[in-house]
């Protein structure tokens, strides 16, 4: 995967436009979770340090395209950056016809989704973005799977288009886990539905030595073995697909589970064998025996790809399976990469972030990469590197 890297360029005096992922939750004008901004800070600081004229932009939320809406303004992000950076920081609302900017200054360009044509990758808008800069830096892996004007179109017309440090690290980590992984390679796919992760399961079944399934996905596999799953969330129409995967890949299906008679935080958990589930019960977590078996597999792994919890970890009574698996990943000497919103929430809950080799910032982009799909932004950067 050969792309031009921002770290290889001399940015002194250049107008640099960074497309970051600053799509953070905001409440009453304040940023409530700063993880994505924190991840982008080293890229911004590196460009400023070189004496570049730095512009950074992002989307935030889902405003009506082409209309300004204060609720989705990047102003709270600007206020946050002012506290963290020693350089001057300001917000530019009307910037499509040009921005006056000094070396060592940071200008945040207002929410790209306020511009008509952003989502449709409009060529005229892409050219306006491109005219603002000498160097375009794509650093938002989380939106690399969408061909939009600020993530894709602009890169086709900017004098130079390169990958930022975050995007480069993300592609390297995914390449290491999927391209030529150290073996045994173990993949974990959790989540509620097989249907939404079908292509991911299919792709990983060809790469992984063992494929661990969790959550509602695992219930479909339990059902595929002929067991009653009661009121559990599962997909009867995908049982043939589950059976096919069981034949082609090593999938350790749970042998014991935690069940409840209702889906609620206060529901009592009952531990039982997977072949003894009653009609009024639903599986909400792995049993201890199954979780410990997975922990053993993970401890011996050399590469781990983790996407999704193995139970309803948001409910304390059904957290144990995910915790055992999470701690086994943290303690394993394997190269581990984790991605997806629920997975990141579990990592935070158990406080193991510094024990995971690489935590992916992209949800949909992470999954599409795992599926083997080409990400439009990455394809564009590869094409520009050839020119």
From Swiss-Prot:
Short name of one Pfam family: PGK
PROSITE patterns membership: PGLYCERATE_KINASE (PS00111)
This enzyme's EC code(s): 2.7.2.3
PANTHER family from the UniProt entry: PHOSPHOGLYCERATE KINASE, PHOSPHOGLYCERATE KINASE 1, CHLOROPLASTIC-RELATED
Binding-site list for ATP: 197, 314, 340-343
GO molecular function, one term: ADP binding
Compartment list: Cytoplasm
GO cellular component, one term: cytosol
UniProt keyword annotations, A-Z: ATP-binding, Cytoplasm, Glycolysis, Kinase, Nucleotide-binding, Transferase
Gene3D superfamilies tied to this protein: Phosphoglycerate kinase, N-terminal domain
Pathway: Carbohydrate degradation; glycolysis; pyruvate from D-glyceraldehyde 3-phosphate: step 2/5
Organism: Yersinia pestis
Subunit structure: Monomer.
HAMAP family xref list: Phosphoglyc_kinase (MF_00145)
Reactions accelerated catalytically: (2R)-3-phosphoglycerate + ATP = (2R)-3-phospho-glyceroyl phosphate + ADP
UniProt-annotated binding residues for substrate: 21-23, 36, 59-62, 113, 146
UniProt name for this protein: Phosphoglycerate kinase
Family the UniProt entry places it in: Belongs to the phosphoglycerate kinase family.
InterPro entries, alphabetized: Phosphoglycerate_kinase (IPR001576), Phosphoglycerate_kinase_CS (IPR015911), Phosphoglycerate_kinase_N (IPR015824), Phosphoglycerate_kinase_sf (IPR036043)
One GO process term, biological-process aspect: glycolytic process
């Amino acid at each position: 995967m050969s792309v031009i890297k921002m770290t290889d360029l001399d940015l002194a005096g250049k107008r640099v436009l960074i497309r970051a992922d600053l799509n953070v939750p905001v409440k009453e004008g304040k940023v409530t979770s700063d993880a994505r901004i924190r991840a982008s800070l080293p890229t911004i600081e590196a460009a400023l340090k070189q004496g570049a004229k730095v512009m950074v932009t992002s989307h935030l939320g889902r405003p009506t395209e082409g209309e300004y809406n204060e609720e989705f303004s990047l102003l709270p992000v600007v206020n946050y950056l002012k506290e963290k950076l020693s350089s001057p920081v300001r917000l530019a609302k009307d910037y499509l016809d040009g921005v006056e900017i000094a070396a060592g200054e940071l200008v945040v360009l207002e929410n790209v989704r306020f511009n008509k044509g952003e989502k449709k990758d409009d060529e005229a808008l892409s050219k306006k973005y491109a005219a603002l800069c000498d160097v375009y830096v794509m650093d938002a892996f989380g939106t690399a799977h969408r061909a939009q004007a600020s993530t894709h179109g602009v890169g086709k017309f900017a004098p130079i288009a390169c990958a930022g440090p975050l995007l480069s690290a993300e592609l390297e980590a995914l390449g290491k886990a999927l391209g030529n992984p150290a073996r045994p390679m173990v993949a974990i796919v959790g989540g509620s539905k097989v249907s939404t992760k079908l292509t991911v399961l299919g792709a990983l079944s060809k790469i992984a030595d063992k494929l661990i399934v969790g959550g509602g996905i695992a219930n479909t596999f339990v059902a595929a073995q002929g067991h009653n799953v009661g009121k559990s969330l599962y997909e009867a129409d995908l049982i043939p697909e589950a059976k096919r995967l069981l034949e082609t890949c090593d999938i350790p299906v749970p042998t014991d589970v935690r069940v409840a008679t209702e889906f609620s935080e206060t529901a009592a958990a009952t531990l039982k064998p997977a072949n003894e589930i009653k009609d009024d019960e639903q599986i909400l977590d792995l049993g201890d025996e199954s979780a410990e078996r997975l922990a053993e597999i993970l401890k011996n792994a050399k590469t781990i790809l983790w996407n999704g919890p193995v139970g309803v970890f948001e409910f304390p009574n059904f957290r144990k399976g995910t915790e055992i698996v999470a701690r086994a990943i943290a303690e394993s000497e394997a190269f581990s990469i984790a991605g997806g919103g629920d997975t990141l929430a579990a990592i935070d809950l158990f406080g193991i972030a510094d024990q995971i080799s690489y935590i992916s910032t992209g949800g949909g982009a992470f999954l599409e990469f795992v599926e083997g799909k080409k990400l439009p932004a990455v394809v564009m950067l590869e094409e520009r590197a050839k020119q």
